[in-house]
């Protein structure tokens, strides 16, 4: 994989298409503002010839707002679709109102679970809960479940040790979580805890999650778990959550939000989620396809901008991506091995940049993979994507 990217960088560096513009050419280019459609389309992107590998920056800028409003509630993907929304990218709240029927679960990133003392727990972040938005989303998307992410925050190793070794602690934790769900009219939670404990005390963590799931189920609530990739990015090594843990938790949890993104690093720039790695992460977790429908394949709706001279990277969301396309009008390149588009541009101060950001084609390929593997998808996160992405779901 790394050899491929070294060749890729060499090809980019030697490419003649990025020659410096003359002053007159630069003025001509600057005088032409790329157009953006503001109206809806009567056809989805699949019928407009937009899901292609030979993509043009001008096409992305022109079409990205133009989704098919007539089919905004129609589903094209049969598996479960979980979408995350965050307070810091508020466009995601609007997305769920328009496209809510395309999702089975929406997970607002609102809440943190903290341990305050012996058998004392508190769920914080409740000030972010928007009951009006929840009512509006449910009104337009019947059967949609709102399952906020619940992050175990500020837990020390001693906190974990004391809780995981005590049935009373686990019981109080479960009671606290269930009561918050009832009070706030949630349909359950997406629990994020596995990364916090690393590889320590996995047996105790599985026991706690099993108990928590049972308590939620007794209250007719859902229990999902965020899990890291089964294969560590850039290696052939197993990750922190493998087939062994999956086999124990799959019978008791309702779903697993699999983080199949963030593959590349600032020191090794490249795609966000190479397709072969994504496939392998699912196959390692469940080689016999026993619980595949509970796996939610992670799709990133954000990208990465790599400054090659600084070994640095920054996340790219939709608005910045579109602005970069407007400013630089780059040549879009399809990486056939990773099944992702990328482009290069230059800044006077920071030098050469390379951007990997999802496109209609890269997303379609991953949705097809999800269908083939028999899994659902989870999207991080709805406020970061482009509006016409949702025609694919």
Curated annotation (Swiss-Prot):
UniProt xrefs under Gene3D superfamilies: 3,6-anhydro-alpha-l-galactosidase (1.10.8.360), 3.10.50.10, Glycosidases (3.20.20.80)
Family: Belongs to the glycosyl hydrolase 18 family.
Lineage: Eukaryota, Metazoa, Chordata, Craniata, Vertebrata
Keyword set, alphabetical order: Immunity, Innate immunity, Lysosome, Secreted, Signal
Signal peptide extent: 1-19
Compartments in which it is found: Secreted; Lysosome
Subunit structure: Interacts with STAB1.
Protein name (database record): Chitinase domain-containing protein 1
GO annotation terms (biological process): carbohydrate metabolic process; innate immune response
Transmembrane segments: none
Domain GH18, residue spans: 79-393
Top-level taxon in the UniProt lineage: Eukaryota
Gene Ontology CC, one term: lysosome
Molecular function via GO: chitin binding; oligosaccharide binding
Pfam families assigned to the protein according to its UniProt record, in alphabetical order: Glyco_hydro_18 (PF00704)
Native organism: Pongo abelii
Function (record text): Saccharide- and LPS-binding protein with possible roles in pathogen sensing and endotoxin neutralization. Ligand-binding specificity relates to the length of the oligosaccharides, with preference for chitotetraose (in vitro).
């Amino acid at each position: 994989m790394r050899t491929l990217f070294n060749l890729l960088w060499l090809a980019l560096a030697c490419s003649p298409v990025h020659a410096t513009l003359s002053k007159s050419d630069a003025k001509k280019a600057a005088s032409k503002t790329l157009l953006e459609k503001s109206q809806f389309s009567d056809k989805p992107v699949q019928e407009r010839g937009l899901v292609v590998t030979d993509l043009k920056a001008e096409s992305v800028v022109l079409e990205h707002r133009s989704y098919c409003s007539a089919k905004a509630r129609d589903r094209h993907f049969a598996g479960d679709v979980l979408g995350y929304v965050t307070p810091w990218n508020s466009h995601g709240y609007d997305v769920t109102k328009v496209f809510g029927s395309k999702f089975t679960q929406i997970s607002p990133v609102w809440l943190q679970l903290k341990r305050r003392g012996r058998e004392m727990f508190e769920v914080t972040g409740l000030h972010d809960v928007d009951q009006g938005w929840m009512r509006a989303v449910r009104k337009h998307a019947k059967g949609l479940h709102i399952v906020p992410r619940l992050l175990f925050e500020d837990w020390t190793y001693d906190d974990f040790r004391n809780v995981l070794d005590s049935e009373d602690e686990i019981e109080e934790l479960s009671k606290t979580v269930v009561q918050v769900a009832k009070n706030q009219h949630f349909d359950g939670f997406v629990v994020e805890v596995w990364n916090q404990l690393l590889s320590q005390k996995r047996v105790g963590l599985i026991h706690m999650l099993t108990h928590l799931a049972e308590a939620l189920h007794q209250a007719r609530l859902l229990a999902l778990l965020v899990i890291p990739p089964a294969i560590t990015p850039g290696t052939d090594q197993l990750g922190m959550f493998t087939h062994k843990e999956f086999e124990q938790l799959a019978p008791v949890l309702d779903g697993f939000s699999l983080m199949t993104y963030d593959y590349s690093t600032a020191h090794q720039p490249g795609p966000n989620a190479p397709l072969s790695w994504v496939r392998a992460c699912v196959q390692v977790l469940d080689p016999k396809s026993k619980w595949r429908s509970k796996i939610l394949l992670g799709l990133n709706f954000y990208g990465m901008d790599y400054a090659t001279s600084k070994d640095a990277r920054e996340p790219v969301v939709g608005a910045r991506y579109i602005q970069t396309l407007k400013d630089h009008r780059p040549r879009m390149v399809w990486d056939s091995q990773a099944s992702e588009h990328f482009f290069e541009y230059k800044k006077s101060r920071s030098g050469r940049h390379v951007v990997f950001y999802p496109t209609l084609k890269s997303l379609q390929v991953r949705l097809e993979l999800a269908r083939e593997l028999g899994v659902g998808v989870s999207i991080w996160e709805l406020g970061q994507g482009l509006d016409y992405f949702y025609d694919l779901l």
